[in-house]
Swiss-Prot record:
It is found in: Cytoplasm. It comes from Thiobacillus denitrificans (strain ATCC 25259 / T1). 3'-to-5' exoribonuclease specific for small oligoribonucleotides. This is Oligoribonuclease. InterPro entries: Exonuclease_RNaseT/DNA_pol3 (IPR013520), Oligoribonuclease (IPR022894), RNaseH-like_sf (IPR012337), RNaseH_sf (IPR036397). HAMAP family: Oligoribonuclease. Its main location: cytoplasm.
Length: 182
């Protein structure tokens, strides 16, 4: 497969909390789209094993959210280490884009990037230093076009693959209703 410099790598991760210093990655997924946001390839959805001590340290929001989705049980059953997950994702993305060509795409993607820089640095280094953060458009729309955000309803599943597709759909929405091509 030929590498395409215009393809975008969309990422989402679920973590045990918000601090890269004390919390860990427990799920990640990547989707490749073309520049028009059409899906080109869907990467693996990887659930990373974490020790009981890490899982037991989660706050009530994370325990409730990841318990309800079944992710806690999948993490406990997983045999996949962070380094093996990183290697699998690198193998996948290298089939679609050259290193440092695609921005990291997603919602509140800076948070994912912080975790990746700490726990999966080779994968983080594969992305361009720029981010395509859909939440930036959401924040601008809230301020400049109040009410526009209300029409796009998110399911807030907090499952990596579902969240990626929701982010892509949200960017399509903003492209149609907020960013006017002339």
């Amino acid at each position: 497969m030929a590498l395409n410099p215009t393809h975008l790598l969309w990422l989402d991760m679920e973590m045990t909390g918000l601090s890269p210093e004390s919390d860990r990655i427990i799920e990640l997924a990547i989707v490749v789209t073309d520049a028009d946001l059409n899906t080109v390839a869907e990467g693996p959805v990887l659930v990373v094993h974490q020790p009981d001590a890490v899982m037991d340290a989660m706050d009530s929001w994370n325990r409730g959210t990841h318990g309800k989705s079944g992710l806690i049980d999948r993490v406990k059953a997983s045999q996949l280490s962070e380094s093996d997950a990183e290697a699998q994702m690198l193998e996948f993305v290298k089939q679609h884009v050259s290193p440092r060509t695609s921005p990291m795409c997603g919602n509140s993607i800076c948070q994912d990037r912080r975790f990746m820089a700490r726990h999966m640095p080779e994968l983080e280094a594969f992305f361009h230093y720029r981010n395509l953060d859909v939440s930036t458009l959401k924040e601008l729309a809230k301020r400049w076009r109040p009410g526009l955000c209300d029409a796009f309803k998110k399911s807030n599943k907090h499952e990596a693959l579902a969240d990626i597709y929701e982010s892509i759909d949200e960017l399509r929405y903003y492209r149609e209703h907020f960013i006017r091509a002339e």
